[in-house]
Every structure is written in structure tokens, then in C-alpha cells.
Design a protein with these regions (language model features):
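Bacterial N-terminal signal peptides that target proteins for export
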Residues: 2-12
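Short active-site neighborhood of thiol/selenol oxidoreductases, capturing the structured segment around
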Residues: 55-85, 91
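Short, internal strand/loop/helix patches
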Residues: 111, 123-160
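Bacterial N-terminal signal peptides
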Residues: 11-21
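Structural microenvironment flanking redox-active thiols in thiol-disulfide oxidoreductases
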Residues: 85-129, 142-144
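N-terminal "domain-start" segment that seeds a small globular fold
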Residues: 26-63
């Protein structure tokens, strides 16, 4: 059986189409409203100031339930992600607006979690992006594993139980 260039090209095209059609079957599902985070143990906040902001007695490992606020806005980022870099100023502005509102200030805490980022990387992120709220290293991607979702940035509002109340998902600019 002699294969022609035309049949080889057609076979390659069909193989590519099958690959692209199969990819969504293996894709991770974005976090959904109502989903509850598993038992995530976060690394210690960068500074004692960040720990104090979250209501922790000191900079130590913690869970969502340890945060002294009924609601937490969590951003999952990576310091090399251009979309995360683009999103950072908007989150900083939102944080400042919440801090100026006496009704919200103590009811909503902000937390950025650096997926696959160590302490040095998130320190640089906090300085370069001028992040005024708590930044947490997550070198083992524990939040992404709890969500079963690794892309970033993801921004979500959770309650004390870890239930997702609102999810922006992935923001593409």
C-alpha cells in the first residue's frame, strides 16, 4: 500500500483535530460558587504585619478558619504570570476602597497566594506590585491542589468554612 502525500497530510490533520477535541476532556474545571476548599494549610504570612492583618497571633501556618474575618478575598497568582501582574493594581485599589469603608473593613480580608512561589519570590512580588495586604508563599501549590485547579490568576471570595461565594475565575486581558 503506497501512501501519498495527500493521505499523509489528511492523516496528520485528523490526528491534530482529535488532539484538540480531546484536550477539553482532560482540562481542570474552574472553581465554582458553592464549592468548598479542602483542608488547605497555608504557609506563614511574609511578615508579622501580614499575620496581624489576618488576625493571626503571629506569622505561622494557618487555615481559612484561623483568619479573623467572616469573608476572605483570595487571589491565586504566580510571580511570573503577566495576567497576574496586570491584575495586581486593580486588587490593590479594591483593597484600599474596602479599607476606607468602616462597614467592610473588618468583615473582608484580602490574601494573595503565590502558587509555586517560595518566600523570596512572593517578597519580590509584594514589593514590586506594592501589595498592601497579606501575601502567602505556596511553593507546593496547596491551594491549587485543594481547588483541583492550577491556572492563575484566580480570584474568589470565600467564607470562614472555605465555601466559594463568588469566583472571578481566570481573567484574560
Amino acid at each position: 500500500m503506497k501512501l501519498t502525500k495527500k493521505s499523509i497530510a489528511l492523516g496528520c490533520c485528523l490526528a491534530l483535530i482529535l488532539c484538540f477535541c480531546a484536550a477539553p476532556l482532560f482540562a481542570e474545571a474552574e472553581p465554582k460558587v458553592g464549592q468548598v476548599l479542602g483542608p488547605v494549610k497555608f504557609a506563614k504570612p511574609l511578615t508579622d504585619e501580614d499575620a496581624k492583618y489576618l488576625g493571626l497571633p503571629k506569622a505561622q501556618e494557618f487555615t481559612i478558619q484561623d483568619v479573623k474575618s467572616p469573608y476572605i478575598l483570595i487571589e491565586q497568582f504566580n510571580n511570573m504570570c503577566p495576567h497576574c501582574m496586570h491584575q495586581a493594581p486593580g486588587l490593590n485599589e479594591l483593597f484600599n476602597l474596602v479599607q476606607q469603608d468602616p462597614a467592610l473593613k473588618d468583615k473582608l480580608k484580602f490574601m494573595s497566594v503565590g502558587q509555586n512561589n517560595d518566600e523570596m519570590q512572593v517578597k519580590a512580588w509584594k514589593v514590586i506590585q506594592k501589595v498592601p495586604f497579606a501575601v502567602i508563599p505556596d511553593p507546593t501549590a496547596s491551594l491549587g491542589k485543594a481547588l483541583n485547579f492550577s491556572p492563575y490568576p484566580v480570584t474568589m471570595l470565600v467564607d470562614k468554612s472555605g465555601k466559594i461565594l463568588w469566583d472571578v475565575g481566570i481573567i484574560f486581558f
